[in-house]
C-alpha cells in the first residue's frame, strides 16, 4: 500500500493510505519512519507505525502532565488511561519515563516529606495514607518516613493550635483538644504525649473563670428544664467537668449560683 496523504492537524498529523486506512501520528513518528507521501509500506510496517504513534503520543501527553508538577507512577498511569491508550503502551511509556528519571516515586516521597517539614503539619500516619493513595509502595514510604524526625513538626502544629484555642478553652480541655487534633493529623500517641509534656500551656485564670460562668449559664438553662435541687447541681457539675473545667472552680461557682 502507498501513503496517499500526510496532513498536519494541530499537534498531530493525519496519515491516509490508498487502501482506506488512516491514522493520526506524531511528528516523531514521521521522523522515526521517514514517512512521506507516495511511500510504499507493508501491513506489518503500518502496524509498527500505529504502535509507535501511540507510544509517541502517550509519552508527549505524559510529559505535558508531568510539566506542571512531579507525579507518581500511578498518577501518570491513570492520566494516560483516560486517553484510551493500551495498557502495554502505557507500561512502556512509564518504563521509559522512569529510565529517563521523569518519574521517580522515591524522589516524590522525599519531596513530599521536605515540604511537610517546611510548611506542613501532618504526622507519619496521615502522610503514609496520602502517599499510598497516590500508588506509592509501602516499602518506599516506610523507609523515607523512618528517616524523618516528626517531633519538630508536631511541636509546631501544637503551638499553632495553642495560639488558636488558648483563650477559648480551660487548660484541661485545651490539652485534650490538642491531643486529639495531633492524633487526627497522623502523629502517634507517644509522640503527642512527649510534645504535650514539654510544652508549657498557660491559661489566664480570670479568662478561664469567665468562660466557666458562660458555660455554666448555658448548661443551667438547658438542665433546669429537666432537673432541680441536688440532681440539677450534680448534672451541672458533671457537664462542666466534662468540658475540662477544674473541679474546685466548678464547686465554687455552683455555691454562688445554686
UniProtKB/Swiss-Prot annotation:
NCBIfam families reported in the protein's UniProt record: PRK14135.1
One GO term (biological process): regulation of DNA repair
Designated name of the protein: Regulatory protein RecX
Gene3D superfamilies assigned to the protein according to its UniProt record, in alphabetical order: Winged helix-like DNA-binding domain superfamily/Winged helix DNA-binding domain
Family: Belongs to the RecX family.
Species assigned in the record: Streptococcus uberis (strain ATCC BAA-854 / 0140J)
Disulphide-bonded residues: none
One GO location term (cellular component): cytoplasm
Top-level taxon in the UniProt lineage: Bacteria
Function: Modulates RecA activity.
Keyword tags: Cytoplasm
Localization per record: Cytoplasm
Amino acid at each position: 500500500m502507498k501513503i496517499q496523504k500526510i496532513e498536519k492537524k494541530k499537534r498531530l498529523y493525519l496519515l491516509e493510505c490508498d487502501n482506506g486506512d488512516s491514522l493520526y501520528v506524531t511528528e516523531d513518528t514521521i521522523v522515526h519512519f521517514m514517512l512521506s507521501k507516495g511511500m510504499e509500506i507493508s501491513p506489518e510496517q503500518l502496524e509498527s507505525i500505529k504502535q509507535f504513534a501511540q507510544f509517541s503520543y502517550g509519552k508527549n501527553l505524559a510529559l505535558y502532565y508531568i510539566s506542571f508538577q512531579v507525579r507518581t507512577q500511578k498518577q501518570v498511569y491513570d492520566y494516560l488511561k483516560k486517553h484510551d491508550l493500551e495498557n502495554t503502551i502505557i507500561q512502556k511509556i512509564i518504563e521509559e519515563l522512569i529510565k529517563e528519571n521523569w518519574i521517580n516515586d522515591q524522589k516524590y516521597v522525599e519531596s513530599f516529606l521536605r515540604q511537610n517539614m517546611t510548611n506542613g503539619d501532618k504526622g507519619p500516619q496521615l502522610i503514609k495514607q496520602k502517599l499510598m493513595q497516590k500508588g506509592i509502595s509501602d516499602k518506599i514510604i516506610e523507609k523515607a518516613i523512618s528517616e524523618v524526625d516528626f517531633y519538630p513538626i508536631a511541636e509546631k502544629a501544637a503551638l499553632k493550635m495553642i495560639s488558636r484555642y488558648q483563650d477559648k478553652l480551660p487548660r484541661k480541655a485545651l490539652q485534650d483538644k490538642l491531643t486529639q487534633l495531633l492524633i487526627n493529623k497522623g502523629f502517634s500517641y507517644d509522640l503527642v504525649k512527649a510534645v504535650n509534656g514539654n510544652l508549657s500551656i498557660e491559661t489566664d485564670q480570670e479568662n478561664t473563670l469567665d468562660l466557666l460562668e458562660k458555660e455554666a449559664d448555658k448548661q443551667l438553662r438547658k438542665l433546669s428544664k429537666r432537673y432541680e435541687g441536688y440532681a440539677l447541681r450534680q448534672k451541672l457539675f458533671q457537664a462542666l467537668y466534662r468540658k475540662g473545667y477544674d473541679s474546685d472552680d466548678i464547686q465554687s461557682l455552683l455555691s454562688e449560683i445554686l
